[in-house]
Swiss-Prot record:
It is found in: Nucleus. This enzyme catalyzes only one turnover and therefore is not strictly catalytic. According to one definition, an enzyme is a biocatalyst that acts repeatedly and over many reaction cycles. The gene is MGMT. Its EC number is 2.1.1.63. Coiled coil: none annotated. This is Methylated-DNA--protein-cysteine methyltransferase. Binds 1 zinc ion. GO terms for biological process: DNA repair; methylation. The active site is at C9 (nucleophile).
Length: 9
């Protein structure tokens, strides 16, 4: 994921 803070994984 390019934005790990917005994604749970």
């Amino acid at each position: 994921n390019p934005i790990p803070i917005l994604t749970p994984c």
